[in-house]
Amino acid sequence: MSEILCHWLNQELKVSQTVSPKSFAKAFSSGYLIGEVLHKYELQDDFAEFSEKRISSAKLNNFSRLEPTLHLLGVQFDQNVAHDIITEKPGVAMKLLYQLYIALQRKKKSGLTGVELQTMQPLTNTKLQNMKSEAFRDRLRNLIPRQTDVSLMRVSHRFQEKYKYKDEDLVHTHLKKLENFQKLQEEQRSFNIEKQRLSRRRQNEIMAQIQAAIIQIPKPASNRTLKALDAQKMMKKKKEAEDVANEIKKFEALIKKDLQAKESASKTSLDAAGQTTTDLLNTYSDDEYIKKIQKRLEEDAFAREQREKRRRRLLMDQLIAHEAQEEAYREEQLVSRLMRQSQQERRIAVQLMHVRHEKEVLWQNRIFREKQYEERRLKDFQDALDREAALAKQAKIDYEEQALREKEMHEQIAAERVQARYKKHYSICAEILDQILDLSTKVADYRMLTNNLIPYKLMHDWKELFFNGMPIYEQASLKHLSAKPSTEQLIELEKRDLLDNNDYEEYKNMVGEWALPEEMVDNIPPSDNRILGHVIHRLIEHSLPPQVESTAPELPSFAIKGCLLGKTFSGKTTALKFLQKYFPIEVLSIDTLVQEAIQAFHNNEKVSGALQLQKAAEEKASPVRQESGDRSQNLHNVLSAEGTPETEDETRLSTKKTPKAEEVIASASLSELTTRAQLGAKSEKLLKKGKSISDTLLVSIVVNAINQIPIYKGWILDGFPMTLNQAKLLEEALTGFNRNLIELEGKKSQISTLAVDPTASREVPLPPSAFDFVMLLDISDNTSLNRMNDIMAEAFLSETPHENINQRVAAENQDMDEDQNLRDQIQHRIIGFWDHWPSLEQWFTEPENILIKMNAEVDEQSLCQKVKEMFMAEIMKKENKAKKKSEEKEAEKKEEFSLPEATPPTPPAPPPSEPEKEKEAHPPHERSKTPTAKGKPASEPPHGNRESPQEGKGKKSETSPKRKGSPRGKSPGGKAPVKKSPADSTDVSPVPAVPPPSKPGSEEWVFVNEPIPEEIPLFLVPYWKLIENSYINSIKTVLRHLREGQHTVLAYLYDTRTGFQQFLRRPDHKQNFVSQWQADFNSLPDDLWEDEETKAELHQRVNDLRDRLWDICDARKEEAEQERLDIINESWLQDSTGIAMNHFFSLMQAELNRFQDTKRLLQDYYRGMECKIPTDDTKRFTRIPLVQLDNKDTLEFQLRIPLVPRRSISPESALSKPKIKALLKGNIDYSLENVELNFEADEKVVMDTWQQASLAVSHMVAAEIHQRLMEEEKENQPADTKEKPPQAAANKKVKKEPPKKKREDKKGKGKSPPMAESAPVITVEEIAEMERKNELRLRIKEEHLAALQFEERATQFRLELIKTKALAFLEDLVTKAVDVYKLMEKWLGERYLNEMASVEKLTEVARYHIETSTKIQNELYLDQEDFFINGNIKVFPDPPPPVRPPPVEKEENGTLTIEQLDNLRDQFLDIAPKGVIGNKAFADILLDLVTLNLGTNNFPSSWMHLTQPELQELASLLVINSELVDWRKFLLVAALPWPIPLEEELLETLQRFKAVDEEQLGTVTFEQYLQAGLWFTGDKDIKIPANPLEPLPFNRQEHLIEFFFRLFADHDKDPPRLDYTEMLLYFACHPDGMEGVYRALSVATGSHVFQPIETPVLVAEKTSSFIDMSPTEEYPEPEDNFISEERELQEEGEEKEEDIPENANTEMISMETLLKVFRGGNEPQDTNRFASYPKTESIYSENFIKVFQDLGSKNLEPIEVAVLLKHPFIQDLIRSYPDYKIPDIKVVLQRSEHIQGSDGESSPSRLTEEKK
């Protein structure tokens, strides 16, 4: 029950405090939870005044408020119950809650609230309850003590507890003191006893010493004393005894000899006789006699032996006595002799003896003392050993704990690192997921904007932002950008730059949005302008300072360089020491190098000694190393760089003070020190300041140490570098290359430049690595910690115990410091390694994988062997590489020697006549000493010869193999004499066929590299950067505006669509007219519905309504069309196209500006190369006009950029054109005509602008060519008139031949007179020089014009591409706008048609209802374009539905109705509440009810014909004994038909009742009764009649279940309770009385009781008894039927008996249970086996007591059912007991109905059929 209550409180009601069975009493002691329960059932309105406190006033308040509510519910509650609950008496709260649970469930079923319950109470009861409540409150206040009293009681109780504890403590202390006192007394007593014992022992020793010192001198005895005489007598006796003994021995020896002789003779005779008489009969012999004799002889021999022993013992005693006598005699003689000495001698003897005793005592004392000393020393030594062992053990424990703590700390740090890494990865994943969500939402947004057609450009931009990890949505606005932008604005700037760069790359490379359209696919894009690239990069190289590059060594070094890395205790130093034994290598440890550097500083290591050592090393090492110079140079750089931060404080102080003399001397002395000493000084200075040595200083120390190693000797670094910065600095210091700078150069080369260097190689060469190998000894963190612990343990165990204590303490302190430092640093070292190793691993593996990983978690020997094998393999690799390089160099040298021999000898160049030429001749010789690397000259020479190595190296990978060895790498000046060697002679030999000359800008073309003035690069390089930046920024800005404009267009078109849709959906007033018409229609009187005139009027009203609605639709259509025209006539499309055209014109302007700037740069460059003055170009650049967006009149001088007004074509002129409009398909829409005309005008403006820009470019190129020709004419006027075939041949071009010829003719005509006048003599050298200059000028002109033509083609191509893209962009924009306008028109038309159709539908519905003369009850809904009849809204209410009458039970076949049964029950209950009534009274009551039935309807009609005899017969069927009738059994039988239960159903019902009855009271309430249920339920298949006026069928079984509760319940209790066991005993009745008894026993015991096997006899007896008792002897047919039924039951019993289990009927049954089953009357009867009446209860009890005693239960304990059923009395009682037999009262009724009828069936058989 407690579990049910807890579940109800916690799960169903969910009270504020969780209740458990253990805390039930405590939880409800305050009354708060009871109030909360009542409040949840809306019975406690003042719950807010309840208190959760546990003080007395709170409890009193709570229970005072609870009392009226509990009494209202009918719960028994008074002050005693409240007091028990408050004092937490067990079970009281649970009982109250159970009653409350029942009452609340009953209240819940009734559905009444608390107020209704109060109003239902009489007024008197309410007043009385108020008075009771006041009295309850007073009594409860008296019972509950005040809180102050409770608090005082608690305080006093607490102090009493404290007093009790203190008293106990005092008693314990007193007992302890007493025990200590007794212990002290006991110790004192034992000490006194020991002291007395020692004193007594000491006294005894002294007395013994005194006694020993005293010498007693005996007196001399006379010979004639009595003692001497006795001794003489004894001697005589001894002698006699010895003589007798000797004689006896002799006699015995003789006798033994005789006996032995006789025995041997008898044995021989007996043997012979035995052999002869073996076969004879065994006759009488004298063996017994002989045996007796032998036995006597044996006894005599044994007696003799005993006597001999006694004799021998006696003789021995005599001999001993004799020897003692002789000894005493000798002592007496000695004493007598001593007695003869003098008294003085005796005194001396006593003194000597005393002295000897004293010496012995002293000696013994000394020995004892030494022994004590030795024991003490041993004890001290053992204590010291134990102390050291304990200390060692404790140290070992501490060490293990420390190691465990270190490991835990490491695991914690590792876990933190893992957690940090997890958080980092999680944040990255979360960020990526957020970006994915942003991308998804952005795509979804734009799918809505673009009707699921997202432009490719937008998606491409979003993907770029997503791949670069930037937010897709705008973080902040960039319109108002402050000086210090916020983080969000910086992110937006980064996004904008990224998209700008991507757009620019697409524009430059003509991919993506700027890919070539279909009409331009056949046009090949122009290639890069190689001439311009060469010019730009030559200018940049001239502007940069000269670089001194290191030269590669002639012979490669075989010395190996490497480093060994790993965690702490990974075995690096051990492995390197092992390698140093077998290989000539140097091991460099950074710690050792730093210490040596500091030590060198302390030792004042000077430069002189180091220089001598260096010279000696240089003399020994003949080959010059390249690395030494680089290292020293880098080292000096490091020193200078390191010196600056260290001397900052000094320089700051020097501003305030003048330097002292000491500081000057110190700085001078520091400069005299060696490099190592200087580095040591700086290191020490940093360490003294508490700082760590910087990476730069560490690298300097390492590089300095490496410089001191001979070149032929290899070196390995031990554990260095440890960080990526150290690795970078070390590589830069050792190789001279900075990998970051190289990567930056590579990135710079990849940056989008406008000019590409044709000679520069695209691949960046890999820098040489500082190491040949890097070896990692990989171990785990735990291994490192374990090795540290092992090393410390070994150091701890290796301490020697015999060393000096001072040295030992100092060494221990030092070791402890080192160990502590090691312990403190091991975690940081491991963490540092993990922090820096990933970057180091990437550094050593990316360009060239030189990293070797090795598992170092092996023993030392295996590790050293592995390292040795790896090192040998690396040495072999190094040697192979060095041999390969040397072979390659030798092959190159051979090629160099073979090439000069193959080339023909060139004639010597003419001697320079001017001093400038002498200057030009010197730089090649100087440069030849230091050849350049990477194809870049160190400094640009003033002549073209410097370009030769550049050409040769830069074109190796690009040119074909045929041109690989050509000598065209020489300068053009050197080529001219070779080609024109025959020009010396006047006779010109015929020239053989020469291949056509190469075109400028091709791969075979050799660029003109004539010297240029120094001012030209200084001016042109910034000018070119300005050109590039302005071009790139202009392109990016325009593309950005185009990109942002696309977003604006999409948003505007979407807003236009949605706005127009909302405009179409604006509300109208059609529904008001429809509602008004419907109200008027429904208000028409009923008598006018069929009138024809009325119908005509209604039709006319419908027509008026339709016309009015059509007018509304037409007006809305006109408004929508006007709205569409307003949207079309807006200037948005025109403004958008104008802005887009201006953007594309800006792109054309950028291309035009770039071309003009490039033309100007090339002109200045080549004029500078020709040593001409640059022209002053005062002409302004060409400007492309932009489109004027507004029509405001502005003055020309106010405009920075020229504007073109927009002119649209008139529609009249446009209609005359036969052109088919591509945008307007199908029917002509005149509203869109203006759009098409504007588009054609814009298209024409774009075409005109493009043609204008293209013509401007062509004119500029033509002007430049014309200017060149004019300059040539001016230069050739003073020249000679002789022909210059080389220049003419080099300058021939198809387009320019006619003007050249004309100008030459003009030149010839105009120059003939001067030639004739001046005819100086010209030498051959001057002619050759002039020819060379003319050829150079011609090459410059060709290269310049070729570069211009390249730029012209590229610009024209770009302009055409921009024009095509602009037209496509404008067409796409106009198409999108026109699509939207057409969509608006489509929506408008569809909506108008839908509205008209809905009006038609409304009209049809209205006409239908007019014709059918019916009202329209549901609302007609006409809104926008939708029309429907709203079934949820009715304009007038429905008529109320008919009420179904309640079900009524009808009489059927004489069965009593439930109402009749209840009436009978009430009458019988008033007369006989106990359930038993007299036989006569019962018959009289029934007779009165039958005869006096005046409209009461107590019985059905079939019962109304019963006579008194029939009623008496009916009573006799129900009689218990001769006089009593059980009226409950009568009503149970009268209520038939109901399903008779089987035994299993009865037991199951009993178990359900027991489960519901948690308190096991044996009774249940009505709610529990319904919850448990019976074996049958109400009829669930009741058919509900279709007619609502017809009542529902009566469910008799459901009402019977409720009637059975009313029949058997005890109504005296409140609420009524039902004894379910007693009820089931009634239901155990059966047509077979014996079967009914067994069923009742089963119900009483709670389990199935099996019948015994004696069935046939029992059945016969049963039938006879039944026949005897049956009152229907006149009707034999029912009796025969019943007998046959009994046979069937017998067969069923036999079947059941076969299935009886072995352990059947083992249940225990008590005396009370047996009496409950066999309940009888009060009439005593005789008891014998043949009595047909049941005995009374008193007689049953006596008989049952006797039965129990007979069966062995003396004290009436319960016995087994099987044992009880074997008793004959019980068997007789079961056979004869009729109370459990169902009487067949229908026989009486049938007889009364059919007095003469004989065709009715008997009731027993019908009952049996119903059961089956």
From Swiss-Prot:
Its main location: other. GO terms for biological process: sperm axoneme assembly. Keywords: Cell projection, Cilium, Coiled coil, Cytoplasm, Differentiation, Flagellum, Golgi apparatus, Spermatogenesis. InterPro entries: CH_2 (IPR010441), CH_dom (IPR001715), CH_dom_sf (IPR036872), EF-hand-dom_pair (IPR011992), P-loop_NTPase (IPR027417), SPEF2_C (IPR056199), SPEF2_D5 (IPR054517), Sperm_flagellar-bone_growth (IPR052634). Residues 618-658, 879-1002, 1272-1322, 1793-1812 are annotated as: Disordered. Residues 618-630, 879-897, 914-929, 943-961, 1272-1285 have a biased composition (Basic and acidic residues). It is found in: Cell projection, Cilium, Flagellum; Cytoplasm; Golgi apparatus. Residues 902-913 have a biased composition (Pro residues). PANTHER family: KPL2-RELATED (PTHR14919), SPERM FLAGELLAR PROTEIN 2 (PTHR14919:SF0). Required for correct axoneme development in spermatozoa. Important for normal development of the manchette and sperm head morphology. Essential for male fertility. Plays a role in localization of the intraflagellar transport protein IFT20 to the manchette, suggesting function as an adapter for dynein-mediated protein transport during spermatogenesis. Also plays a role in bone growth where it seems to be required for normal osteoblast differentiation. This is Sperm flagellar protein 2.
